[in-house]
Amino acid sequence: MFTSLYNKLHRQLEYMQTFHASMGHVEILVNSDKRFLEGGPSIGKKREELVKRAEGKYLCFLDDDEDIADNYLETLVRLCHRDADVVTFRSFAKLKGYWCLIDMGLHYPNDQANPNYTVRRSPWHVCPVRSYFAKLYSFSDINYGEDWLYFEQVLKHCTTEAKTESIIHSYQHGDHSEADKIVQSEQGTRSNSKVLR
């Protein structure tokens, strides 16, 4: 799934450079270290390394269990030109076998996911945020929940947002992401250790 996402980003970047070069520079950084289950660093360490490498005015993350709309990059760049602290948008999320619409906003509560109505949530690490604020904090050296622990701190500095009502992103919770495989592995290890006792 990552290769498909990476290719989409590069196609959108080529389009931007060809038709909207005046909108500025976009940097796509990838951490290709081994996965944690193969002896590589934690997801938190990988994210931290990317934050340190980032040189742009804004930064955000995309993971291997996410997808983007064809206008994702252009939409975000246009919103970043509004010079707000964070950029927010709408996203589809597949959780526990159902899809729901997530509407992210700076002053929104974190509603529980529900397939029957639009779920309002605070901005997540997938939302572009001022790099200055992002670099004030570090990701924890963990594999699950590192994104919210980090972004919750960063959001304390955000007072303005640039928002689109467009759905430009999707997240599909499942067994294929690195974090999900790590959690499954840890649960399996705990189950096996109980059986062996």
Model-identified regions with their sequence ranges:
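Short beta-strand-to-loop element that shapes/binds the nucleotide-sugar donor at the catalytic cleft/hinge
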Residues: 87-101
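Short, well-formed alpha-helical segments that are part of the catalytic scaffolds
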Residues: 1-20
